[in-house]
From Swiss-Prot:
A motif (Cx9C motif 2) lies at residues 49-59. It is found in: Cytoplasm, Cytosol. Disulfide bonds join 28-59, 38-49. It comes from the Eukaryota. One of its GO terms (biological process) is mitochondrial cytochrome c oxidase assembly. Belongs to the COX19 family. Residues 25-67 form the CHCH domain. The keyword Cytoplasm applies. This is Cytochrome c oxidase assembly protein COX19. Its main location: cytoplasm. It comes from Dictyostelium discoideum (Social amoeba). Keywords: Cytoplasm, Disulfide bond.
Length: 106
């Protein structure tokens, strides 16, 4: 049986920062659970859980579960400075019509 050769399939590339080993010994389970709980309490909005995220990343670096990196390189300050805009009102009983927000600006 012959298979067609698909030239659009690309070879997988490794992550930019190298491997991200699993925490088999649960060395960072407490900060990880604190971060996951924070996400759960904040509807998955990570900007409210940055301190927990920092602690988790620091734990991983301290336990050689990831390469040491300056915390400034993770973009936490950019997130703090970002303007937060409310999500548009959504009523599940109303139909969605494309282009309404553009029409209001014109």
């Amino acid at each position: 049986m012959q298979f067609a050769h698909n030239s659009s399939i690309q070879k997988p590339t490794p992550p930019d920062k190298g491997s991200f080993p699993l925490d088999h010994d649960s060395e960072c389970s407490k900060p990880m659970l604190a971060y996951v709980n924070c996400l759960s309490e904040n509807n998955g909005l990570s900007r409210f859980c940055m301190e927990f995220s920092k602690e988790y990343l620091k734990c991983r670096m301290d336990n050689n579960l990831m390469a040491k990196e300056d915390m400034d390189n993770f973009g936490f300050e950019e997130v703090k400075k970002a303007k937060i805009v409310p999500a548009p009102h959504y009523n599940p009983n109303e139909p969605i019509v494309a282009g309404l927000s553009r029409r209001k600006r014109d």
